[in-house]
């Protein structure tokens, strides 16, 4: 581990030199790439330097104990050693996490797709609840959201809603939302007071750049039509709505949220790139799992990941066994407690895998 940390520190120092090189300063691509690489290494290098400083202080303190000291001073040195050893242990654990392989998509924007599943209108209302939950969470993180496509229902729910979340690190936190979300509550239309169970599915896709997912123009069929509102009524006499079909994969994306056909096509292309990338990633994962004879775990969107129980004001994340009695706050966008627990669980599993591999 420490050989790797030395190599990281050397690379960081080399990047500092490169970023002061006039040839790099005058090359926008190199400047951007080196700056990003340096930023990615900064926390690891700072933590490693703090670790080395603590080790040095610890060695000095232990050396002092070899000398003749007054009892009171000796006790103070022992206390300092205890504190430094505790800090050293914490820094080692932090460095282990920092050295884990990074998800290359973590810093990207996100395309989120929420669809009503089992439960009819109640599922559509729940899809609307989830959409509002995520937009409020995004706002609390300083991220911006933008609707790409929506199919609203008459009672204020959504059969489907697709929206963009723009912000640094959005995917690193929202990627854990992939899966089936279940709600248990008494519908307003239920006279007998019986609890109904409904579900909605959430897909969280990283936004992909054109250079990352190559799509040939000949592989796309573009259809245009008049946009429509709830119930199918036309809301636009111009042919502004766009449907893109990726012929090789059969993936279809529609967008009619904008009045401009050009803007709708741009939004649809973003979703198409993300879905194609996700399809290839899922195929690669499935092949890997089959080779290793591993069962597909998190990331399988048919898997029920979380239950929202209204009568008990309870949210349970089934993947990590976390239950909190704060449903009202969670639906108001206060997702930090759940997401941070999921991140810690993910890191723990990666550390176990790294230890097993070594």
Swiss-Prot record:
Q: Which domain of life is it from?
A: Bacteria
Annotated localization = Cytoplasm
Q: Which GO terms describe its molecular function?
A: translation release factor activity, codon specific
One GO cellular-component annotation of the UniProt record comes to:
cytoplasm
**Annotated S-S bridges:** none
**Post-translational modification N5-methylglutamine, affected residues:** 233
Q: Classify the main location.
A: cytoplasm
Alphabetical keyword list:
Cytoplasm, Methylation, Protein biosynthesis
Q: Which InterPro entries match?
A: PCRF, Pep_chain_release_fac_I, Pep_chain_release_fac_I_sf, Prokaryotic/Mito_RF, RF-1
Posttranslational modification: Methylated by PrmC. Methylation increases the termination efficiency of RF1.
Give the HAMAP family listed for this entry.
Rel_fac_1
Relate the protein's function as given in its record: Peptide chain release factor 1 directs the termination of translation in response to the peptide chain termination codons UAG and UAA.
Family to which this protein belongs: Belongs to the prokaryotic/mitochondrial release factor family.
Q: What is this protein called?
A: Peptide chain release factor 1
Top-level taxonomy: Bacteria, Bacillati, Bacillota, Bacilli, Bacillales
What's the gene? Answer: prfA
């Amino acid at each position: 581990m420490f050989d790797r940390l030395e190599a990281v520190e050397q690379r960081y120092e080399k990047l500092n030199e490169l970023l002061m090189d006039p040839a790099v300063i005058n090359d926008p691509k190199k400047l951007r790439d080196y700056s990003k690489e340096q930023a990615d290494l900064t926390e690891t290098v700072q933590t490693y330097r703090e670790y080395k400083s603590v080790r040095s202080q610890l060695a000095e303190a232990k050396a002092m104990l070899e000398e003749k000291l007054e009892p009171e001073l000796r006790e103070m040195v022992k206390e300092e050693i205890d504190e430094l050893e505790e800090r050293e242990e914490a820094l080692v654990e932090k460095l282990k996490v920092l050295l884990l392989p990074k998800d290359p998509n973590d810093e990207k924007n996100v395309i989120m797709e929420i669809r009503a599943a089992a439960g009819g209108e109640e599922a559509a209302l729940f899809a609307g609840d989830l959409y509002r939950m995520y937009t409020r969470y995004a706002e609390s993180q300083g991220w911006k959201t933008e609707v790409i496509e929506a199919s609203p229902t008459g009672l204020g729910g959504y059969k489907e809603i697709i929206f963009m979340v723009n912000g640094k690190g959005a995917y690193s936190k929202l990627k854990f939302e992939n899966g089936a979300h279940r709600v248990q509550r008494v519908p307003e239309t239920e006279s007998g007071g019986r609890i109904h169970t409904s579900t909605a599915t959430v897909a969280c896709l990283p936004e992909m750049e054109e250079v990352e997912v190559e799509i040939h123009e000949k592989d796309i069929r573009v259809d245009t039509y008049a946009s429509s509102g709830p119930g199918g009524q036309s809301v636009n006499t111009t042919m502004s709505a766009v449907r893109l079909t990726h012929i090789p994969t059969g993936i279809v994306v529609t967008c009619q949220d904008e009045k401009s056909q050009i803007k709708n096509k741009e939004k649809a292309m973003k979703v198409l790139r993300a879905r194609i990338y996700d399809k290839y990633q899922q195929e690669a994962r499935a092949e890997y799992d089959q080779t290793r004879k591993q069962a597909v775990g998190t990331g399988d969107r048919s898997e029920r990941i979380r239950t929202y129980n209204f009568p008990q004001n309870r949210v349970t994340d089934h993947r990590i066994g976390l239950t909190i009695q704060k449903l009202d706050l969670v639906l108001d966008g206060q997702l930090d407690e759940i997401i941070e627990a999921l991140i810690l669980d993910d890191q723990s599993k990666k550390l176990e895998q790294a230890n097993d591999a070594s």
